[in-house]
């Protein structure tokens, strides 16, 4: 495969001149290349520190840190000036580079000429003889010089004769010559033969016509010379064509910190740009569009708006939003979904939108979404009722470790709905009339037996669940309770001691 013949691999570089007779052109080409993009200058702009860069390159650099990429001096976009002379030089070098490089890479070919193939008066033979030169010097070596001088004299005489013949055969000297009026849109005055516009002939005859056709006929009218287009347009011609074209207006920069998201999206919409994405992406998109647009204003051949939009899209997919390109093309899919959703929204907002056809087409999808939403609500309701039932039932089913058992029992005792004995008869309040202790009433004023003591102990364990410290605290509070006066039956009875029984 011819690698050098493929344009994808044949990237022009200044090192292409190495190994050729024109290796001295390598620094010349390096001087014509930008220090940022390493390509030929495209609309070169001169900074305030006298450095030159491409218009797009320097504007991107200044939009980041407002400093020159070479000397790191502070600069602004408003101080950039176009270097048009360098632009003309770069264009001329780019147009002639391919031809010069092919000429430098082509080896010189010398054709050998045999004596019998050329006559004695052949100029190529004389040229070859002069290039080779005599090997031995002799007195007759000066003859070619005299013959050369005589040849030059004869050539000069022949040239003079040709010029004289041309002068003798001019149309003015030919009696049969008929003057043809030039096709320039003008007419000649019938008296003085002065050429002018047809509308000016009558006024010329009344005011400024000399009125002597003999004197006017003696001098030959000089036709108006129309400028002929040159195959090599000069700098002045290009400058005139540039000044005739009205340059596009530049876009001003925005203070993004002073704009809300709605205002920024409105600015992008006015410029015909996309409005989807985060706040950071919107700012970067607007800033890059301003850079592309203002750099295009500096170009001698501005691009179309469609080309600039294509460049912006390429920048956003490669540089502007690199996070979307990660993950094996997931970002591109996200951009596609976002663009599709945006197009769908615009379609729905259209006043000619067919709602019935849309409902018929996507009714099944909406029904599935509604069904899923209802099932989710029902599931959440059932889960909430189950949690409430578990809470009312004491949270059965949960495994509690031994270390958490005392704390859990104390919490259950505090929040239990069953009243305790202390809640029924507080220690500091006297009992109501006719109220008797359940244990004492059960034994009819007699000392309780072992069965009664066991039942009382079981009842205390049920009423006040918890640790032995909690039970001991309850017994102490019962012992410290003062006797109730006026109740002989209760005052005569003693509380049984479980240790003695």
Swiss-Prot record:
Annotated source species: Neurospora crassa (strain ATCC 24698 / 74-OR23-1A / CBS 708.71 / DSM 1257 / FGSC 987)
Name of the protein this chain belongs to: Postreplication repair E3 ubiquitin-protein ligase rad18
Region described as Disordered: 111-154, 203-250, 377-501
Chief localisation class: nucleus
Basic and acidic residues biased stretches: 127-142
Top EC class for this record: transferase
Keywords for this protein: DNA damage, DNA repair, DNA-binding, Metal-binding, Nucleus, Transferase, Ubl conjugation pathway, Zinc, Zinc-finger
EC number: 2.3.2.27
InterPro entries documented for this protein: Rad18, Rad18_fungi, Rad18_UBZ4, SAP_dom, Znf_RING, Znf_RING/FYVE/PHD, Znf_RING_CS
Protein family membership: Belongs to the RAD18 family.
Ranges of biased composition (kind: Basic residues): 143-152
A single MF term (Gene Ontology): ubiquitin protein ligase activity
